[in-house]
Amino acid sequence: MKGILVAGITAVLVAAVESLSCVQCNSWEKSCVNSIASECPSHANTSCISSSASSSLETPVRLYQNMFCSAENCSEETHITAFTVHVSAEEHFHFVSQCCQGKECSNTSDALDPPLKNVSSNAECPACYESNGTSCHGKPWKCYEEEQCVFLVAELKNDIESKSLVLKGCSNVSNATCQFLSGENKTLGGVIFRKFECANVNSLTPTSAPTTSHNVGSKASLYLLALASLLLRGLLP
């Protein structure tokens, strides 16, 4: 009897030590920064997930945060995925997601973008956005260095409503993230990416301007110079 009691107490203590607490918050517009962590359910007691999406676009998706407990194993102790898509100099969409193995995540706003580099003169991507739909018609936008073209369709939702975003532009997204999200209906940090396509701008060859008129003009200029030379020779004694 005593042995059974000791074993029971030990099991309770081990369970208490292994329990995980995460911030559990899903919000539009309001920040989850001041939310308090609470104990995770037994079926999602492996890691904490924290994701946020913010934009300066004229769409319903201005600020979205989703923090929850997960049964997922992180690829690292703390794995952060972050990228920004630029549509213009003033318009952008920023996404960051953390997977924190066995511990609470830090504020996702700490994962800031690296400083932007110079604009690459040969790198252009179609840039546009829509609140709904499956595509948008973009105008060319010059990318910063180390950016690539991105076309994504994302669905962000909570228990009450769902909002969609269609986006094309220049992004600093990594090739690993492109590969992971490529295809359809991939979920990262609670956000469903219905479509995520990347194109390396370095592989794009700029369209060459027609040279016909330039060549004709050059030949005409040479002909006039030769004719003028002959006339001058005939007039001189």
UniProtKB/Swiss-Prot annotation:
GO CC terms, sorted: extracellular region; extracellular space; plasma membrane; side of membrane
Locations listed in the record: Cell membrane; Secreted
Known function: Secreted protein specifically required to prevent invasion of Gram-negative bacteria in the inner mucus layer of the colon epithelium, a portion of the large intestine which is free of commensal microbiota. Prevents invasion of flagellated microbiota by binding to the flagellum of bacteria, such as P.mirabilis, thereby inhibiting bacterial motility in the intestinal lumen. Segregation of intestinal bacteria and epithelial cells in the colon is required to preserve intestinal homeostasis.
Propeptide: 216-237
Free-text description of this protein's post-translational modifications in UniProt: Highly N-glycosylated. Not O-glycosylated. GPI-anchored. The GPI-anchor is cleaved, leading to secretion into the colonic lumen.
Domain UPAR/Ly6 span(s) in chain numbering: 125-176
Tissue: Expressed in the large intestine. Preferentially expressed on the epithelial layer exposed to the lumen (at protein level).
Glycosylation sites: N45, N73, N107, N118, N132, N172, N175, N185
Protein name as it appears in the record: Ly6/PLAUR domain-containing protein 8
Family: Belongs to the CNF-like-inhibitor family.
Keyword Glycoprotein applies: yes
CDD domains given in the database record: TFP_LU_ECD_LYPD8_rpt1 (cd23568), TFP_LU_ECD_LYPD8_rpt2 (cd23569)
Signal peptide positions on this chain: 1-19
Organism: Homo sapiens
Gene that produces this protein: LYPD8
GO biological process, one term: defense response to Gram-negative bacterium
Keywords: Cell membrane, Glycoprotein, GPI-anchor, Lipoprotein, Membrane, Secreted, Signal
Lineage: Eukaryota, Metazoa, Chordata, Craniata, Vertebrata
Residue numbers with lipid attached (GPI-anchor amidated asparagine): N215
Topology of this chain in the membrane: Lipid-anchor; GPI-anchor
